[in-house]
Curated annotation (Swiss-Prot):
The keyword Metal-binding applies. This is D-fructose 1,6-bisphosphatase class 2/sedoheptulose 1,7-bisphosphatase. Belongs to the FBPase class 2 family. It catalyses: beta-D-fructose 1,6-bisphosphate + H2O = beta-D-fructose 6-phosphate + phosphate; D-sedoheptulose 1,7-bisphosphate + H2O = D-sedoheptulose 7-phosphate + phosphate. Pathway: Carbohydrate biosynthesis; Calvin cycle. The lineage of its organism: Bacteria, Bacillati, Cyanobacteriota, Cyanophyceae, Synechococcales. Catalyzes the hydrolysis of fructose 1,6-bisphosphate (Fru 1,6-P2) and sedoheptulose 1,7-bisphosphate (Sed 1,7-P2) to fructose 6-phosphate and sedoheptulose 7-phosphate, respectively. Mn(2+) 1 binds at residues 33, 57. It comes from Synechococcus sp. (strain CC9605).
Amino acid sequence: MDQTLIQEILEIVEQAAIASASLSGKGLKDEADALAVDAMRKRMNQIQMQGRIVIGEGERDEAPMLYIGEEVGTGTGPGVDFAVDPCEGTNLCAFNQRGSMAVLAASDRGGLFNAPDFYMKKLAAPPAAKGKVDIRKSATENIKILSECLGLPVDELNIVVMDRARHKDLIAEIRGTGARIQPISDGDVQAAIACGFAGTGTHCLMGIGAAPEGVISAAAMRALGGHFQGQLVYDPAIAQTSEWADMTKEGNLARLAEMGIADPDKVYEAEELACGEHVCFAGSGITDGLLFNGVKFEKDCTRTSSLVISNLDNTCRFTNTVHIKEDAQSIALS
């Protein structure tokens, strides 16, 4: 990857965010997702690269576009693997709630873990706690370590947890330490990345979410120098999801074995989930969130707010872009 490609990757998420935001607040989550997928794919196919979707909208027979294994780009240029979520937080977008964004991770060929469509136990923390907190430790232990690493009393720590029934015991344990719970309804990618930045008020992400989004979070945290670990969850009793109503623990283990995952209980570090030499994360806000604003539609322009994190040059770029409409007459500075 080079700087030109990274700029084009930014444009991919910007276009997806704009498309999805056109339906924000209208209660049409599937339609908003479809618009984002179409816009993301269209921009990808204009880029001189040999792109491949390793995490996308589903298997080939389940998704018409951006399916796993789909080739994108012009077919010439560098080989790039993508993990994409064109509309992360579709419910958030549909009801115009905070935290929806268009996101992707990119790496050189073979540089991203091909995560199954499973759940994943996740732990994200700031760079100061990298390698010190551990997903195998209890929440109580990790909160104590986090307090020491950040120099903050436990009762000032904000721990993000998705508001799900499966987290009832986890939430009780966290509250038992005196730390604060910051519940979110959807969209844990932005919450995980926010842990990597001081001043966001987000100190740690704990709990179970989707595995594909875990890879995207890992790519960002690796490039940022933050802590991220993930462990696949294959037991329906733990995941507590209706999506696995027809699956059993044994059936899920068989699926993992077929995918070549020999140790289903393995704890993956960020550097294993995003192992490429060059790793890039790009996100653009659909609605306002922890890290950036959502899309703003104005008479003469559309404004996007985005973030690109890359280990190519060890940079984080917060970008506000003004997309000028044809026949624009007046563009405000902000």
